[in-house]
Structure formats: structure tokens, C-alpha cells
């Protein structure tokens, strides 16, 4: 197909730039500048030729998954373990975000719905969502994050008395985590699906499906692109259009129960959507 040759040309040119020019250059600034300009060119190509698949962007174009995930982990090393760190420049919308999550969760938990025994918070950070949304509903929690500093701060400081109700902390990258079978009433994934490639997100959702208790649900809350997809090469986050996300969910064998946009955020912020599935 037409776009295949173009995509291969981009890959070949970047490999030469990265392996020959940048490897021998003493200028880290030059290296970063070249990367930024090259990513910008590739994203322009994606917009012009929508048949280019996001999987190629995240898994092939960035010279393999290890580099893609290393960049995200390296980015979060500089993020402070605080609400400000978790919310970036938008800590003022934290309460709005939590209230929207609480109202969405109510639709799926209670008599005749998902139980309240145990929930898993994926990409939990310091536990902002666990503390503000999940602990008030569930008897116990399990929390997962790739950053040890965040988990330690959650347990030792941020969660307070709630920490006594945490069954397990998992220091894992989500793409490598195998959740226990039939364990959770709710699996909450907020601002973490954006850090997985299409393939790894689909495969994690397949594993997560097997870890749900009867009537259990998986909830993804994440930034959604207004059109196509966008990659931030600094922190390796992918903003997908809602249709792209829905396609990944369906390929994982899950049924979408409800989709709702988070209201009350400033117009300048990328739209945030909540998706419930089982």
C-alpha cells in the first residue's frame, strides 16, 4: 500500500540519524532537537494518511517497545510525589475530576451490580483516585504503579488511615502485570492507558477481564484526542481518539457498558472520557 513505503522511509531515515549521527554527537541538545522535529514530521504524516496505524508508531517507529517505555519511566523520575505532581499544571481541577469519577462509578457498583469487596487502581501514583474515589466504596484496595517513590509516599503519608486497607502494592509496569484471576470488582485505569502501546493495552485488558469478579467492571478514564492520535515523545503518552480506544477494547473481547465525557474542565484541556466495560 502507498503509506507502507513512506513509513519505511521514515523508519530507515530515523535509524540512520539515531545510530550514526546522534550516537557520535556530543550535543544532547542536538539529539533532542532532531527527535522533536522528526516526531513532528511523522505526526503530520499520520494526519495526512490516516491508514498509518498507531501500532506502527508506538511499537515500530520508536525502535521497539523498550525505548518507548523507558522514556515514560525516565519522565516520571522528575515528577514530585504530590497532588500537584499527579495533576501537572491542572491541580485546580482535581476535585472536579474526582467528583466526576465518583458519579460515574455509582452507575456500576451496588445491589445487582459490581460488588464492593476489592478494587485495583492501575497507575495509582500517590493514590489520589484511590483516596478520593475508591476507598470510600470498597472494603479493600490493591494499588499498582511503576514508580516506587509514589507508592512509598502513598503508604507512608498520603493515604493516612486508608493505608491499612491496602491488601497489596504492586511495583510493576502495567504491560508486564498479570493480575490474579477473579479478584476485583472494579479495575480503575486513569491516565495510564495512554502510556501503553495498542498491542500492550489490548493484551492487558484481556488479562484484566479474567481478573474480574461476577458483574465486575473495568473503567478507563483518559485523555482522548479530538481527531486521530497524538504522541508526546517526551513522556511517551498517546492521546487516542475515542473511536480508536473503543476499537482496542472490542478487540480485547470486552463489551462497552457506558461512555461519558468528564464535564467541568477548561476548554483548553484535552477532552477526558470515561469508559466502562466488562
UniProtKB/Swiss-Prot annotation:
Keyword S-adenosyl-L-methionine: yes
Pfam families: Methyltransf_PK
Entry similarity comment: Belongs to the methyltransferase superfamily. NTM1 family.
Protein name: N-terminal Xaa-Pro-Lys N-methyltransferase 2
InterPro entries in the cross-refs: MeTrfase_NTM1, SAM-dependent_MTases_sf
Record keywords, A-Z: Methyltransferase, Nucleus, S-adenosyl-L-methionine, Transferase
Keyword Nucleus in record: yes
Organism the protein comes from: Danio rerio (Zebrafish)
Residues annotated to bind S-adenosyl-L-methionine: 123, 128, 145, 174-175, 190, 195
Catalytic activity annotation: N-terminal L-alanyl-L-prolyl-L-lysyl-[protein] + S-adenosyl-L-methionine = N-terminal N-methyl-L-alanyl-L-prolyl-L-lysyl-[protein] + S-adenosyl-L-homocysteine + H(+); N-terminal L-prolyl-L-prolyl-L-lysyl-[protein] + S-adenosyl-L-methionine = N-terminal N-methyl-L-prolyl-L-prolyl-L-lysyl-[protein] + S-adenosyl-L-homocysteine + H(+); N-terminal L-seryl-L-prolyl-L-lysyl-[protein] + S-adenosyl-L-methionine = N-terminal N-methyl-L-seryl-L-prolyl-L-lysyl-[protein] + S-adenosyl-L-homocysteine + H(+)
BP terms from Gene Ontology: N-terminal protein amino acid methylation
Gene Ontology terms for molecular function: N-terminal protein N-methyltransferase activity
